[in-house]
A protein has these predicted regions:
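Generic hydrophobic/aromatic pocket-lining and core-packing "Φ" positions
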Residues: 10, 50, 83, 105-106
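Alpha-helix-loop-beta-strand connector modules within alpha/beta enzyme cores
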Residues: 1-6, 25-28, 32-46, 75-101
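Glycine-rich phosphate-binding active-site loops on the catalytic face of alpha/beta enzymes
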Residues: 24-33, 62-74, 99-125
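Conserved, mostly hydrophobic/aromatic
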Residues: 13, 53, 61, 86, ...
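Structural motif
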Residues: 16, 56, 89, 110-112
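Short acidic/polar active-site loop segments enriched in Thr and Asp
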Residues: 19, 59, 114
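Histidine/lysine/aspartate-rich catalytic loop segments that bind and position anionic ligands
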Residues: 40-43, 47-69
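Conserved alpha/beta-domain cores
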Residues: 1-8, 12-27, 32-33, 51-56
């Protein structure tokens, strides 16, 4: 029972009959509506992003950057306390992202997330 969610490309999700798509924050704000027959996740970086994702009926959100990350080296991380405050204002299931490693899974859960999203930590296994 594995679900495959592709990053940012709705057309490929349909072409390869994938389960869903993870939208970047630009797509979150630009799309007038989300596909109803795909799981849809949204990258969020603020309370407003989470509100938009919820209003457009996203299935989940990915919130960060929680920690310093190589992907966005100039971005000031929000930290776990801010992450928790934003999670508590939303009804969406939320994954933490940004500098996450396997050792952050428990922290994400403790601060209200449902898990982590990561690129480098997964490929490093």
């Amino acid at each position: 029972n594995v679900r495959i969610i592709i990053n940012s490309n709705i057309d490929l999700a349909y072409e390869y009959e994938l389960d869903g798509v993870h939208l970047n924050s630009k797509q979150l704000h630009e799309l007038s509506h989300f596909p109803k027959d795909l799981l849809v996740g949204a990258s969020c970086h603020s309370e407003n992003d989470l509100k938009v994702a919820e209003e457009k009926n996203a299935d989940f959100a990915v919130l960060g950057s929680v920690k310093k990350t190589l992907t966005h080296p100039d971005l000031e991380p929000m930290g776990w306390v801010r992450f928790s405050k934003l999670v508590n204002k939303s009804n969406l299931p939320i994954y933490s992202i940004g500098g996450m490693t396997n050792s952050d899974i428990l922290s994400s859960l403790e601060y209200g997330g449902i898990g982590i999203a990561s690129q480098r930590a997964i490929w490093a296994i």
